[in-house]
């Protein structure tokens, strides 16, 4: 019997959780500053949702999904990405009927993909993302990009670059598709078996192939930018103008198509350019989608969003030597110097905690010196010593663990003393 972690998963131990809390808090604060509200969706959905939403020609659907049958014979899939579930909820709960548009939502949830585990890539991973539904204005595209860039600035990741592209509207993509088929078809035998299937199913996916990405025919493939109609060109120009107005630098990569079938018009990636982190490591990716709500049974509703892999962000912070704020420090360790002080120790610790002061005590009946050593090990700012004299007088010995200074403080003033000291920090 194998009782160890399944491959591609990991435990987040207590000493690591503060890093996750830091990212989650910063992301929440940035999103809510932009007036995005949190949404939470089920960890599994009907398989058809992802087949229709993500696209059955994508690697995600064809190779990476965790799919199973429940006891009722229904095909269910652990969610591999966030957008399809959010859009499904948008349609199912008729959020498109809301007076205030666009509907702006963010999420922070586990996703699952069966792929080879490596640095920053796990089979269970956490994705933070946003979706803005109900506006086809290019300014919302730039708001979404700006939010992502602001999040990276807040957490200290500045060695990054923004890469954008346009996939155009349906008319533009159809013309580009025809050109791709004509370009690849005479040489399709030079490509992997999957790309040979993709040629007539969805040739755009050939540009995104992991096996053939170095093939010169991909590098010389017709650019989508040459097939944009007048409307799509104008849309992309507006996106670029807004980015310039916000002084957000960007590069254009016409080969960037993203790994999902639902995108149109704007697509973007934010990449790390940190030395030693790997060339073009994508930290955030997203884009615009116009047909997904209709595909799920709702009215024509445009959308725009992105996803960020938390594990990859943590790795990027580590590579960049960015220090993440530590967990909340232990402010007071209450030392009970004799058994008779135990009851008072329990009530004092409880009183401190109820007043917002982080407090701890010994639970192993250790001797005085062992408790003092434990307080040091836990980096307590202060200790309060409860001995026979303290129990009789009601005055406690408050010791500053950094300076060694010690003073007697009455029970009635101890909370005020600690609160004042806390405010000075």
UniProtKB/Swiss-Prot annotation:
One of its GO terms (biological process) is histidyl-tRNA aminoacylation. GO terms for molecular function: ATP binding; catalytic activity, acting on a protein; histidine-tRNA ligase activity; transferase activity. It comes from the Bacteria. Its EC number is 6.1.1.21. Keywords: Aminoacyl-tRNA synthetase, ATP-binding, Cytoplasm, Ligase, Nucleotide-binding, Protein biosynthesis. PROSITE patterns: AA_TRNA_LIGASE_II (PS50862). One of its GO terms (cellular component) is cytoplasm. It is an enzyme of class 6 (ligase). Its main location: cytoplasm. PANTHER family: HISTIDINE--TRNA LIGASE, MITOCHONDRIAL-RELATED (PTHR43707:SF1), HISTIDYL-TRNA SYNTHETASE (PTHR43707). Homodimer. This is Histidine--tRNA ligase. The gene is hisS.
